[in-house]
């Protein structure tokens, strides 16, 4: 079950006043906390000007406390504004945190945590079976049957380890977006290139005509932070808004960490803004409600299936899962050229992101796509898991 605990009106070390913002902490073993790093979320209705005034005040308070006590905290790091859901990430000492919590404009404060990819690399070459499976009611076909519009006019944001945008599988349809993880824009891991190839590659992908945007939020070791993920989501929404493609966009997040209300709130705002959001359920063979962003009810949470139409042994499960998609031994592009096989709910999620773009390209509303995918799905999973839906992704090809 969800393990986020609200400490009512108390910090762990000292009592606080009744009017203070809520301090949320993770008491579950899924969360790997980042010391003295916090995500601060403002109350709904706080104006842009009031938000900027608050940020300026916090920066000043931090500078004063740092000089007074000699702490080595970095202070304000980045701001978020996702369709008026406003907040920021910072590295603060306890005294500055106290001041933040006492501000009536703050809704809640959450400690930042590590987020990791949800994929496992296996051998470098394997038969590709996922495309055939999602375009046929029955297992066994290697043919991918699809409408040739294939996501044309739709943009998919790959929020991941980066993407090799020059890979031949993308046919010039991929562009660079932003990097909230490090100073190296290359995909040194391979995970992001693989997932992008799955959702929109020419050879390996579902939506073969969709545009692709690389949003790097994880480093070469496949890890990042909740604050970095939110910054990436913030970029996606603002980019889509500026380009006038809200309603013609999708987002894939093949990653996860312990439960985070801030992470869930961010993806919910993106989904409600008109970007279809697909997320990996996670790879711990546990209830996905304990993970974020998988536990956000508004997004499409994806579990992994095998070529035998069974639940992948590693896949998370539970009532929050919306749909299964192929995730074991999936072959797709690797950085620098060529291909490789990977397994994980990371590989299942981009099948759904690509299928979402496929439907959006045919006129579907991104806010209704997950429900439409569930209606189209095939009840084929032999052991979906306790309380988990028996729905396998299908594109409605008639095969």
Swiss-Prot record:
It is an enzyme of class 3 (hydrolase). Its EC number is 3.4.21.-. Residues 38-117 form the Inhibitor I9 domain. The keyword Signal applies. Residues 20-118 form a propeptide. Its main location: secreted. It is found in: Secreted. Pfam families: Inhibitor_I9, Peptidase_S8. Residues 1-19 form the signal peptide. The active site is at 160 (charge relay system), 191 (charge relay system), 346 (charge relay system). The keyword Metal-binding does not apply. Gene3D superfamilies: Peptidase S8 propeptide/proteinase inhibitor I9, Peptidase S8/S53 domain. One of its GO terms (molecular function) is serine-type endopeptidase activity. One of its GO terms (biological process) is proteolysis. Glycans are attached at residues 252, 395. Residues 380-392 have a biased composition (Polar residues). Keywords: Glycoprotein, Hydrolase, Protease, Secreted, Serine protease, Signal, Virulence, Zymogen. Secreted subtilisin-like serine protease with keratinolytic activity that contributes to pathogenicity. Belongs to the peptidase S8 family. This is Subtilisin-like protease 4.
């Amino acid at each position: 079950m969800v393990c986020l605990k609200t400490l009512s009106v108390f910090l762990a070390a000292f009592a606080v006043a009744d009017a203070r913002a809520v301090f949320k902490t993770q008491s579950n073993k899924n969360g790997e906390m980042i010391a003295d790093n916090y995500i601060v979320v403002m109350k709904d209705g706080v104006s842009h000007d009031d938000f900027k005034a608050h940020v300026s005040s916090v920066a000043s308070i931090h500078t004063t406390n740092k000089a007074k006590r000699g702490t080595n905290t970095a202070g304000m790091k980045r701001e978020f504004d996702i369709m008026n859901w406003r907040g920021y990430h910072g590295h603060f000492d306890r005294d500055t945190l106290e001041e933040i919590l006492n501000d009536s404009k703050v809704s809640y404060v959450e400690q930042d945590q590590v987020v990791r990819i949800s994929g496992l690399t296996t051998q470098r070459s394997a038969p590709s079976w996922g495309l055939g499976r999602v375009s046929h009611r029955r297992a066994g076909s290697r043919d991918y049957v699809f409408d040739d519009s294939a996501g044309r006019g739709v943009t998919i944001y790959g929020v991941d380890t980066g993407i090799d945008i020059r890979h031949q599988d993308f046919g010039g349809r991929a562009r660079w977006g932003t990097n909230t993880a490090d100073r190296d824009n290359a995909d040194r891991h391979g995970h992001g290139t693989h997932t992008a190839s799955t959702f929109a590659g020419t050879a390996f992908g579902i939506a073969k005509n969709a545009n692709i945007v690389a949003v790097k939020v994880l480093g070469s070791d496949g890890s990042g932070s909740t604050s970095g993920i939110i910054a990436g989501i913030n970029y996606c929404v603002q980019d889509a808004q500026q380009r006038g493609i809200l309603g013609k966009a999708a987002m894939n997040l093949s990653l996860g960490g312990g439960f985070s209300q801030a992470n869930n709130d961010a993806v919910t705002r993106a989904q409600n803004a008109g970007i279809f959001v697909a997320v990996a359920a996670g790879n711990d063979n546990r209830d996905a409600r304990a993970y974020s962003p998988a536990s956000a009810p508004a997004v499409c949470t994806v579990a992994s299936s095998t070529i035998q139409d069974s639940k992948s042994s590693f896949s998370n499960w539970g009532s929050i899962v919306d749909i299964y998609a192929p995730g074991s031994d999936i072959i797709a592009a690797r950085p620098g050229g060529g291909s490789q096989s990977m397994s994980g709910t990371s590989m299942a999620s981009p099948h759904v992101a690509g299928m979402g773009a496929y439907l959006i390209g045919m006129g579907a509303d991104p806010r209704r796509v997950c429900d439409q995918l569930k209606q189209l799905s095939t009840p084929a999973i032999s052991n979906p898991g306790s309380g988990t839906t028996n729905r396998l992704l299908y594109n409605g090809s008639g095969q």
